[in-house]
């Protein structure tokens, strides 16, 4: 993935938080009003507290004071503090509606791009999920902390500086400004020092997670090779490296906090000495000194808040950068993917050729190679110069040795990969057709039967959500699933089914779609012999269907209209069972070997 600088990331995040509707713009205006009013009421409450202290001093010293005035100041202080708290809390609650919209839009867009860019990007599902989860969490933090915490803190600082100047003059404002500037400079320097650990910590964390995931995924291999202790030791070494980096980072954070606290402690002592001297000279009252102390402590709290956000912003932006780079990479892959040039949403159906001798599927000098990657520096050619025609209504079997490219042929028809050469489905050139329209006219079962960990009903109806219940039951029966439905029910989840039962669910889903073209990749390989023959007989009796099957069992070829034999990515033989047996070539040898 390409990287981007921090300013670009910040601009992208700001654009994501931009209001997208009048209601959201009004909500942002209310949030801004909450920020302004909340901090203004906070500063006013500090001044009111000084008046209360002055009144209490008069009671103790002279014994005469307007008690009702003190009560009024106390009531005003209570109202101001309550309003300040109410507005301060309201802004975060209101802004959460914006952050929720941003995260939802980001996640939906990533999922949409991932589905369109599948097989064009190298990222693994687990890695993609980790980046999206971390990135969305950190985007929320950046937006919330920046707009509802950092912005109010800056506004509060401006109000406090103004009030210090108005009430106490430059004599006190200058040292406060100098300390704030030193605080900011020191924080920036320490953040630069801390930044050197940031990337190493992320890399070490990812390395540990990847090591655990790979060990769990390949646990049988680890045990078979007696490498349990080796893997544990290797993981321990990587974790020691990670903890050392995190310890250094914590030390840097500790030094940052220590320096920040020391600066404002010195300022507070300086202000206290000057304030006490002014109070002794009757240039300042006790209440004024209390207000000044409160201002200094409030400035310290605001600077501490900003420093904390700046301290964590680097880590947050790292995950945000990963998510934005992932988004851009998926967008490029989707633009280069199958059917990217076609207006997928604007084409209602896949154009078809006039009836007659038009082919349902036609390959013309088609080649395909998996793209180069870090794992595979040399592109692996899977198909080379493949040409054949499958007529409408034909039942065709594709056979060959493992790795010969049989499954890839079906995947290319489904527009799951880019290819060289021409592929036509019902007379339509794939690259000028809508992927949605082409796939909508095809019922398919891919290798290893992809299913969701949901109910039988959910998986059977997947892609056909409006199918009637009676149709669902009928296709479950046709797929041999009736006994499973009676025993376990339609709401049983996939993990409660065996491999053969899962394959029946895939068959029922394909039958329910009732598409004119069916692509079946070893769709009955896990069924028992009786069920397999029943399902195969049902498919052979389907009228008006073009069926293309990748076969694992050669007994079926005798009942098909034609057989395509693929070897090493090229078509070696094409014909009926009897024709290929007469050639006494590869098909004859495979058939003879299967009977022995």
Swiss-Prot record:
The family classification in the record reads: Belongs to the ABC transporter superfamily. ABCB family. Heavy Metal importer (TC 3.A.1.210) subfamily.
Q: Supply the Pfam families for this chain.
A: ABC_membrane, ABC_tran
Could you tell me which residue ranges the ABC transmembrane type-1 domain spans? 39-318
* Cellular localization per UniProt: Membrane
Task: List ligand-binding residues for ATP.
Answer: 370, 400-411
- Protein's UniProt keywords contain Transmembrane helix: yes
MF GO annotations: ABC-type transporter activity; ATP binding; ATP hydrolysis activity
Q: Which residues cross the membrane?
A: 26-46, 173-193, 289-309
For this entry, the protein name equals Probable ABC transporter ECU01_0200/ECU01_1410
Q: Spell out the coiled coil positions from the record.
A: none
Q: Looking at the record's lineage, which domain of life comes first?
A: Eukaryota
Domain (ABC transporter) ranges: 361-593
GO cellular-component term (any): membrane
Do you know which InterPro entries this protein is assigned to?
AAA+_ATPase, ABC1_TM_dom, ABC1_TM_sf, ABC_transporter-like_ATP-bd, ABC_transporter-like_CS, P-loop_NTPase, Type_1_exporter
Q: How does it sit in the membrane?
A: Multi-pass membrane protein
- What keywords are annotated for this sequence in UniProt? ATP-binding, Membrane, Nucleotide-binding, Transmembrane, Transmembrane helix, Transport
């Amino acid at each position: 993935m390409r990287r981007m600088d921090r300013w670009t990331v910040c601009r992208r995040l700001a654009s994501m938080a931009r209001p997208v509707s009048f209601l959201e713009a009004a909500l942002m205006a209310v949030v801004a009003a909450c920020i302004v009013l909340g901090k203004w009421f906070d500063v006013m409450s500090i001044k009111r507290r000084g008046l209360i202290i002055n009144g209490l001093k008069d009671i103790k010293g002279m014994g005469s004071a307007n008690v009702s005035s003190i009560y009024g100041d106390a009531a005003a202080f209570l109202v101001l503090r309550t309003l300040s708290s109410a507005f301060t809390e309201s802004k975060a609650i209101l802004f959460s509606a914006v952050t929720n919209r941003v995260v939802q839009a980001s996640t939906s867009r990533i999922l949409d791009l991932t589905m369109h860019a599948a097989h064009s990007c190298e990222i693994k599902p687990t890695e993609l999920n980790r980046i999206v989860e971390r990135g969305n969490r950190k985007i929320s933090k950046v937006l919330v902390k920046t707009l509802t915490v950092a912005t109010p803190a800056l506004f509060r600082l401006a109000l406090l500086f103004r009030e210090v100047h108005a009430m106490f003059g430059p004599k006190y404002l200058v040292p406060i400004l100098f300390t704030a500037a030193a605080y900011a400079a020191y924080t920036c320097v320490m953040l630069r020092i801390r930044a050197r650990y940031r990337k190493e910590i992320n890399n070490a964390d990812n390395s540990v997670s990847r090591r655990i995931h790979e060990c769990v995924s390949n646990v049988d291999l680890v045990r078979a090779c007696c490498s349990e202790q080796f893997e544990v030791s290797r993981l321990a070494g990587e974790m020691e490296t990670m903890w050392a980096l995190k310890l250094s980072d914590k030390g840097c954070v500790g030094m940052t906090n220590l320096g920040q606290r020391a600066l404002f402690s010195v300022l507070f002592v300086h202000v206290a000495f000057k304030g006490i001297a002014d109070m002794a000279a009757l240039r300042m009252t006790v209440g004024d000194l209390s207000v000044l102390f409160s201002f200094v402590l409030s400035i310290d709290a605001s600077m501490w808040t900003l420093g904390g956000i700046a301290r964590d912003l680097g880590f947050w932006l790292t995950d945000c950068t990963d998510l934005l780079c992932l988004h851009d990479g998926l967008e490029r892959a989707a633009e280069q993917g199958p059917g990217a040039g076609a207006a997928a949403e604007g084409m209602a159906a896949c154009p078809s050729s006039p009836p007659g001798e038009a082919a349902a599927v036609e390959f013309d000098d088609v080649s395909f190679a998996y793209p180069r990657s870090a794992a595979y520096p040399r592109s692996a050619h899977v198909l080379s110069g493949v040409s054949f025609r499958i007529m409408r209504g034909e039942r065709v079997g594709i056979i060959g040795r493992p790795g010969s490219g049989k499954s890839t042929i079906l995947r290319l028809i489904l527009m799951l990969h880019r290819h060289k050469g021409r592929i036509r489905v019902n007379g339509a050139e794939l690259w000028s057709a809508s992927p949605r329209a082409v796939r909508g006219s095809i019922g398919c079962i891919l290798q290893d039967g992809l299913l969701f960990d949901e109910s039988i009903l959910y998986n059977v109806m997947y892609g056909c959500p409006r199918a009637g219940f009676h149709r669902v039951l009928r296709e479950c029966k046709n797929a041999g699933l009736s006994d499973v439905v009676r025993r376990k029910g339609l709401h049983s989840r996939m993990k409660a089914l065996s491999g053969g039962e899962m394959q029946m669910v895939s068959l029922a889903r394909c039958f329910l779609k009732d598409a004119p073209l069916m692509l079946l990749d070893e769709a009955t390989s896990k069924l028992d012999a009786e069920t397999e023959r029943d399902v195969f007989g049902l498919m052979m009796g389907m009228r008006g269907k073009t069926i293309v099957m990748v076969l694992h069992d050669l007994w079926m070829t005798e009942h098909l209209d034609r057989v395509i034999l693929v070897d090493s990515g090229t078509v070696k033989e094409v014909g009926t069972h009897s024709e290929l047996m007469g050639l006494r070539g590869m098909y004859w040898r495979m058939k003879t070997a299967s009977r022995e």
